[in-house]
């Protein structure tokens, strides 16, 4: 079940909120846990629910055992819990890809191996690992109530696509009564509507542009249309994922929780490094705290720094998907981030205008690598981005103009909303009709678009 569907908006959410606030406050974590598991079952099915339940039980028990144990026993429980978490992620997400590549090398048929990827597994496994690591380090106390832990681990606003929570992000709210607050519900609903608009009005409508490019064939695009498509996909992905994150923040606020922001105007960045401090913030923090720093980070010389960056960005690519284009994407990011750290960082810092041009030129190209899984088709697309480096001529010379007729307003709106000005306007006037009336209109427009069947699944849900 997706947030941008009529059953969620008109059945699940109103019913859940009614039960959540009608029951006595001491039962709200139980309602949150059970309601979240119901939400997940409705969207992902019984098999995926069993995987989630198993990991909840394993990590709840491991947290208590680690906290109560001493010496090597604590480390043993940590390793066992991490093996369950990482092993589950590898089995469901990477085993098929690993066997496929092994089969090519050994001429062996592994086609018998088929396993469905549980919805959101990459997100909730990383959240489980963070919990276990924090308990082991003494940065968090293990939850003593299974229902409280399940409410934290399975909280439906962020379960499928983040933000990736740490217990300390919500611990205070998790252990308080969270009384009904009209102001919190109104504030949360406004955030939800902004996110819904990003998803339904922008991301879902931009999705048809890429479909049109696939229909034409990447090898037959003109260079202008290829660049137009790369920028269009960059906007689509941003408003799809950032829209979900805003909806998650809004829903959590309606329930009495304040969860971390996952995006901070990433397309206003001046470097690839800065972008990744603004995009999917909780994933970046996770890799920093649980991988980059333990590997040595920047504290042990340039070689260790390069090794740490290489491991982090290769695994960042693989986290997004089991395919070679994701590995390549992670390596491309590693190269540019290493260049910024060792070679061009000072230049970018001194030249604001040139640094923005550098970023805006590079990043749409990295999203092309991210999106096209077939490496041959990826080569075709880049041959259209740089036609002077390849054989053949740009064809369909008027194709950009035909697409501009349909998409110019989405590009204009998407670029405007990616700047700081709309956020400043919202913060200044959010209690006035200047904000509420447009939000009301956006909500009804979204309902119309959803009812007419123009929506698409969330892109990051497949990770």
Regions found by a protein language model. Give the residues of each.
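Membrane-embedded transmembrane alpha-helical bundles that form the catalytic cores
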Residues: 1-462
């Amino acid at each position: 079940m997706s947030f941008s569907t009529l059953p969620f908006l008109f059945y699940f959410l109103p019913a859940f909120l009614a039960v959540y606030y009608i029951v006595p406050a001491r039962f709200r974590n139980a309602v949150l846990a059970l309601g979240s598991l119901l939400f997940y079952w409705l969207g992902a099915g019984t098999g995926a629910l069993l995987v989630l339940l198993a990991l909840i039980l394993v990590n709840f028990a491991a947290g208590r055992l680690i906290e109560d144990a001493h010496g090597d026993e604590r480390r043993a429980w940590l390793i066992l819990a991490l093996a369950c978490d990482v092993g589950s992620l590898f089995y469901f997400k990477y085993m098929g890809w690993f066997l496929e590549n092994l089969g090519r090398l050994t001429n062996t048929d592994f086609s018998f191996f088929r396993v469905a990827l549980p919805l959101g597994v990459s997100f909730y496994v990383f959240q489980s690992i963070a919990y276990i690591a924090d308990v082991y380090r003494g940065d968090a106390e293990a939850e003593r109530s299974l229902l409280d832990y399940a409410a934290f681990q399975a909280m439906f606003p962020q379960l499928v696509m983040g933000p990736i929570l740490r217990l300390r992000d919500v611990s205070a709210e998790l252990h308080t009564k969270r009384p009904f607050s009209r102001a919190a519900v109104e504030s949360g609903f406004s955030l939800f509507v902004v996110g819904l608009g990003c998803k339904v009005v922008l991301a879902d409508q931009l999705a048809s542009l890429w479909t049109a490019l696939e229909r034409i064939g990447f090898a037959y695009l003109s260079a202008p249309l290829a660049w137009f498509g790369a920028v269009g996909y960059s906007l689509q992905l941003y408003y799809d994922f950032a829209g979900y994150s805003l909806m998650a923040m809004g829903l959590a606020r309606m329930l009495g929780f304040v969860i971390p922001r996952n995006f901070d105007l990433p397309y206003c960045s001046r470097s690839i490094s800065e972008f990744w401090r603004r995009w999917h913030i909780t994933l970046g923090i996770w890799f920093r705290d649980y991988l980059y720093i333990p590997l040595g980070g920047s504290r042990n010389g340039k070689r260790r720094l390069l090794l740490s960056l290489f491991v982090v960005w290769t695994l960042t690519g693989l986290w997004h998907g089991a395919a070679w284009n994701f590995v390549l994407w992670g390596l491309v990011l590693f190269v540019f981030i290493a260049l910024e750290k060792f070679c061009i960082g000072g230049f970018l810092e001194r030249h604001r205008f040139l640094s923005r041009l550098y970023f805006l030129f590079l990043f749409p190209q990295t999203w092309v690598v991210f999106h096209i899984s077939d490496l041959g088709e990826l080569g075709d697309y880049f041959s259209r981005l740089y036609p002077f480096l390849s054989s053949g001529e740009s064809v369909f010379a008027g194709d950009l103009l035909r697409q501009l007729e349909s998409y110019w307003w989405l590009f204009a709106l998407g670029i405007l909303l990616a700047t700081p000005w709309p956020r400043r306007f919202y913060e200044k006037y959010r209690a006035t009709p200047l904000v509420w009336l447009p939000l009301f209109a956006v909500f009804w427009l979204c309902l119309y678009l959803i009812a007419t069947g123009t929506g698409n699944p969330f892109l990051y849900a497949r990770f």
